[in-house]
Design a protein with these regions (language model features):
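Conserved beta-strand segments of alpha/beta enzyme cores
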Residues: 26, 187-189, 278
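C-terminal-of-GTPase-core extension/linker across diverse P-loop GTPases
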Residues: 60-182, 199-201, 213, 217, ...
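Cytosolic ligand/metal-binding cores
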Residues: 205
Length: 381
């Protein structure tokens, strides 16, 4: 490697590059050095992808996931899985060599137990993608509620700037406003949504439709209500919000500075008796109790055992797709085994599992996949 120290003039730098290229050098391609390391066997494909993830990480959580991956956590897990699958395949294929003698080298009970364990491990990795994806790209948080309840004021308070327009006129927010905030090393993507209500205004109606769409995509829903509203009215709003599987919802009683402590306490008690969800009182305008809100958000993510215990968490969409396919092939092998299919068909399903796992670490890959992966790298990596 040659390092050139020169004056900082752009012209001088360009001239040095021109002379180097004239003498036979060429510009490095994106990801070329990492690709060379992969092709030389210094790292597997999942580790190479982790290099790009480390460069692109914009939070401590995203960096932690990428660091675990580049240190070989994936490699060890998938090498172990592939070794077990290869053992199964070799026993099944050995039966084919002695097919005329009707001999079973692979005990079917043991085979079923091993496939069950392998399917569970692959499924657990695949299921971890939901957490890994939101940690890598930011946890989507939808702030929803009626018009003028203080959603935009809350976003401005969290950002410490006037990002969203605040007005006493209902329906001011018609389009979605999205901003990212880092809370203790985790990136949260806050979406300030249009107030939900019946309206004849077509533009406002479009904004409400977008709101409901983003609510379905959010990992966390913050339903903001007026702390002065009766608990029955708040309960009705809560029941109107669609909460999908895996989503979390918290009830935020805003404008607590205009309600008595007794009133807030009674509302909290009534609402928590009917709903097993967090209920928090804040004052977005006065920035009261916002620390409790940010702590609630952080804890909702960090409470996941796999994040705290250092378990493998999948954050790459390509890996998740391969794991889903591997899980499907493993399930087919299990069903085939239970149905008494022949060893050659069983071996074919297991080879398919091996293929999908091999695409993650690079044992099996194509030039198109490599081009797609390394084209995302910056020059010099």
């Amino acid at each position: 490697m040659l390092e050139i120290s020169c004056h900082g003039s752009t012209f001088i730098q360009q001239e040095i590059l021109r002379l180097c290229i004239r003498e036979g050098a060429r510009m490095a391609q994106g990801g070329e050095f990492t690709l060379k390391a992969f092709l030389a066997g210094k790292m597997d494909l999942s580790q190479a992808e982790a290099v790009a993830d480390i460069i692109a990480s914009d939070s401590r959580a995203a960096l932690t996931l990428a660091t675990r991956q580049i240190r070989g956590g994936y490699s060890k897990e998938f090498t172990d899985l592939r070794q077990q699958l290869l053992e199964l395949t070799s026993l099944l294929e050995l039966e084919l060599d002695f097919s005329e003698e009707d001999v079973e080298f692979a005990d079917r009970t043991r085979l079923s137990a091993m496939l069950t364990e392998i399917e569970h491990r692959i499924s657990s990795l695949s299921d971890s993608f939901r957490l890994g994806n939101i940690l890598k790209n930011g946890v989507p948080v939808a702030i929803v509620g009626s018009p003028n309840v203080g959603k935009s004021t809350l976003l401005n308070a969290l950002l410490n700037e006037e990002r969203a327009l605040v007005s006493d006129i209902a329906g001011t927010t018609r389009d979605l406003i999205e901003e990212t905030i880092n809370i203790q090393g985790v990136t949260f993507r806050f979406i300030d949504t249009a107030g939900i209500r019946d309206t004849a205004d077509p533009l406002e109606h479009m904004g409400i439709e977008r709101t409901l769409q983003r609510v379905r995509q959010a990992a966390i829903i913050l339903l903001m209500v007026d702390a002065n509203d009766p608990s029955e009215q708040i309960e009705a709003q809560l029941q109107s919000i669609p909460v999908g599987e895996g989503q979390q919802i918290a009830l935020i009683l805003n404008k607590s500075d205009k309600a008595t402590e007794e009133q807030i306490a009674l509302s909290k008690k009534a609402l928590q008796q009917k709903n097993a969800i967090p209920v928090l009182s804040i004052s977005a305008k006065q920035k009261g109790n916002l620390q409790a809100l940010t702590s609630l958000l952080y804890d909702s993510v960090h409470a996941d055992e796999s994040l705290r215990s250092g378990q493998l968490i999948v954050s790459n969409a390509r890996h998740h797709e391969a794991l889903e396919a591997a899980c499907g092939a493993t399930h087919r092998a299990q069903n085939g085994l239970a149905g008494g299919i022949s060893g050659d068909l069983l071996a074919q399903d297991i080879r398919e599992v091996l293929h999908h796992l091999g695409t993650i670490t690079g044992e099996i890959t194509s030039q198109d996949i490599l081009n797609s992966i390394f084209s995302k790298f910056c020059i010099g990596k």
